[in-house]
């Protein structure tokens, strides 16, 4: 068979391949930082219970971590490593901070689906609801975002307060991203040592109406106590008391970790102190802790007494040694003369 020159379609395919190869050479490869994932590279969000293709995805190749942009932005304890710039669509997430948030989420169960990894908490300080971001969406939680300052908050449907100081308030079910309606180039997220809180610690307190009469308030508290008592009885009957107290212990452990963090804010100390010390449940605990303080004082005084005796012994030894050396020097002088 005679060898024929390349046909027109084959030439076209060759040109297309060359153009595609050149385009791939231009696109920067991931270098261990979070980057918007390409469509052909499947990445699973580390903060979601399942892979949902409805948010910008960042990933760190060196750590094998991927997370949706919204899961990062609305996670309660996560910070960005640079000041927010409204004119720049890129986000700045510190890899170590993301790893720490993933670890924190392993202890938190989602209010909606019951699975671990729920790092998005209701911003009302007295509310203990935690979600995965998309579970919060399914539970009709309300998103509050301020594009000028880069503040992102989530309130559960029960505690959503339209009278707040954030300009953008909308249900999570109505949140969409422009990244899927237009072509976007791969974007990088940089990493630096400068971290900035996104303002989640400035929680908004939803105050109950003060128009209720005192009698109604007492009746309400009594009814609330009856409901809670019935809840505990049903937990006991269902064999779920261990699970309930496991959740309580997990919460206390998280509070301890929060206090041990070097970046703990003054508002966090105030919030945790109020929650712990205003609860009658811990009155006996505080009394016992006072005894522990007294015991620590006693042990410290005992160590101080022992140190004093040790210092006196060393000083006496030093004086004896000096006297011995002086006597030896005098004897040597007498012999030489």
Curated annotation (Swiss-Prot):
Functional summary from the UniProt entry: Positive regulator of Th1-type cytokine gene expression.
Zn-finger (PHD-type) residues: 108-160
The organism of origin for this protein: Bos taurus (Bovine)
GO cellular component terms listed in the entry, alphabetical order: nucleus
GO molecular function: zinc ion binding
Cysteine pairings via disulfide bonds: none
PROSITE patterns on file: EPHD
Keyword vocabulary terms for this entry: Activator, Metal-binding, Nucleus, Transcription, Transcription regulation, Zinc, Zinc-finger
Subunit composition and interactions: Interacts with BRCA1 and RELA.
Entry protein name: PHD finger protein 11
Coiled coil: none
Statement: the UniProt record of this protein carries the keyword Zinc-finger: yes
Zinc fingers, C2HC pre-PHD-type class: 42-78
Cellular compartments annotated: Nucleus
Main subcellular localisation: nucleus
């Amino acid at each position: 068979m005679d060898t024929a020159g390349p046909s027109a379609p084959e030439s076209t395919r060759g040109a297309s391949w060359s153009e595609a190869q050149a385009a791939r050479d231009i696109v920067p490869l991931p270098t261990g930082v979070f980057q918007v994932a390409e469509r052909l590279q499947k990445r699973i969000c580390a903060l979601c219970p399942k892979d949902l293709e409805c948010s910008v995805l960042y990933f760190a190749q060196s750590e094998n971590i991927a997370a949706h942009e919204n899961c990062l932005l609305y996670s309660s304890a996560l910070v960005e490593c640079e000041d927010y710039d409204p004119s720049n669509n890129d986000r700045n997430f510190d890899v170590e901070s993301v790893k720490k948030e993933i670890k924190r989420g392993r202890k938190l169960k989602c209010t909606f689906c019951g699975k671990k990894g729920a790092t998005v908490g209701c911003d009302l300080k007295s509310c203990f609801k935690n979600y995965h971001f998309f579970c919060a969406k399914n539970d009709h939680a309300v998103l509050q975002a301020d594009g000028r300052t880069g503040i992102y908050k989530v309130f559960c449907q029960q505690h959503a307060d339209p009278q707040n100081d954030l300009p953008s308030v909308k249900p999570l079910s109505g949140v969409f991203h422009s990244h899927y309606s237009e072509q976007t180039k791969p974007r990088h997220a940089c990493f630096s040592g400068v971290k900035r809180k996104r303002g989640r610690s400035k929680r908004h307190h939803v105050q109950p109406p003060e128009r209720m009469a005192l009698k109604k308030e007492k009746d309400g508290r009594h009814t609330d106590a009856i409901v809670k008592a019935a809840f505990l009885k049903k937990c006991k009957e269902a064999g779920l008391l261990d699970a309930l107290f496991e959740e309580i212990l997990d919460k206390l452990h998280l509070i301890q970790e929060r206090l041990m963090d070097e970046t703990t804010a003054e508002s966090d100390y105030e919030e945790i102190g109020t929650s712990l010390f205003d609860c009658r449940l811990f009155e006996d605990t505080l009394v016992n802790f006072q005894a522990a303080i007294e015991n620590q004082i006693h042990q410290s005084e005992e160590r101080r007494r022992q140190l004093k005796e040790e210092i006196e012994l060393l000083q006496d030894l030093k004086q004896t040694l000096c006297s011995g050396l002086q006597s030896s020097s005098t004897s040597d002088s007498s012999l030489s003369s």
